[in-house]
Regions:
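N-terminal Rossmann-like NAD(P) cofactor-binding module of classical short-chain dehydrogenase/reductase
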Residues: 15, 83-84, 106
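NAD(P)H cofactor-binding loop motif with strongest signal on the N-terminal glycine-rich segment
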Residues: 18-19, 87
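Glycine-rich phosphate-binding loop and adjacent beta-alpha segment
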Residues: 34, 42, 90-161, 195
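Glycine-rich NAD(P) Rossmann-fold beta1-alpha1 loop
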Residues: 21-25
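C-terminal hydrophobic helical "lid"/dimerization subdomain
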Residues: 143-195
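Single conserved hydrophobic/aromatic residue that forms the stacking wall/gate
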Residues: 1-6, 10
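Adenosine-nucleotide cofactor-binding segment
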Residues: 32-91, 142-144
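Short conserved AdoMet
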Residues: 76, 100, 186-187
Length: 195
């Protein structure tokens, strides 16, 4: 999760793609609570404002800004020690360009499609990078680990450090509409279907 990968980059900058989405807005809050400066990618000025309200330190609007160039500017040329990429195919190469030497790319989703045909040699060319593809099952692999994670999450919510905002609700009969809006990046925060 955010806390385990960010623990040794306390008060440093991380990059998080899709910072105004459900997972991204939660990551903005969590990073801020940990004292980590989250740089979030977004697709509009409205989403940039939303991500900042959720705790993002800075945002990059990829619809008209060069993400890798802005990361260099925001980090004073150092890049980010950790990049979180839940988008996948569309952001893979940009993510690699934003990771600091010997840094970590956390590839946890594939909203734009799966990353395929990875040439491992690119990791050395970009600065001896590390890549991980975590799953919840890999971290919550025992009842004890699951309980620790739940305690941390609900503890943060109880302390008011995290809040879960349901930004859009759709009846189950409109699932196709909700999916289209999510795929077209027309939503912010979390979207739920109501039976």
């Amino acid at each position: 999760g955010v806390s385990s990968a960010a623990s040794d980059v306390y008060k440093r900058q991380i990059l998080f793609h899709a910072a105004a989405g459900g997972v991204g807005s939660f990551a903005c809050q969590w990073a801020k609570a940990l004292g980590v400066k989250l740089i979030g990618t977004v697709s509009s000025a409205k989403k940039a404002e939303y991500a900042k309200q959720q705790g993002a330190w800075a945002t990059i609007d990829y619809s008209h800004e060069n993400v890798a160039q802005r990361v260099l500017e925001l980090t004073e040329g150092k890049k980010c020690p950790v990049v979180y990429d839940g988008v996948g195919k569309d952001t893979w190469e940009t993510s690699l360009d934003c990771v600091a030497p010997r840094g970590l790319l956390v590839s946890f989703g594939n909203a734009s499609g799966a990353v395929t045909g990875v040439n491992l040699g690119i990791l050395s060319q970009k600065g001896s990078l590390y890549v991980t593809r975590p799953t919840l099952a890999g971290y919550a692999n025992t009842a004890d680990n699951l309980q620790k994670m739940a305690d941390e999450l609900f503890g943060m919510i109880a302390k008011g450090k995290l809040s879960v905002e349901i930004a859009q609700r759709y009846p189950l009969s409109e699932a196709a509409t909700a999916q289209t809006l999510l795929s077209d990046r027309k939503t912010t925060g979390s979207t739920i279907l109501v039976p």
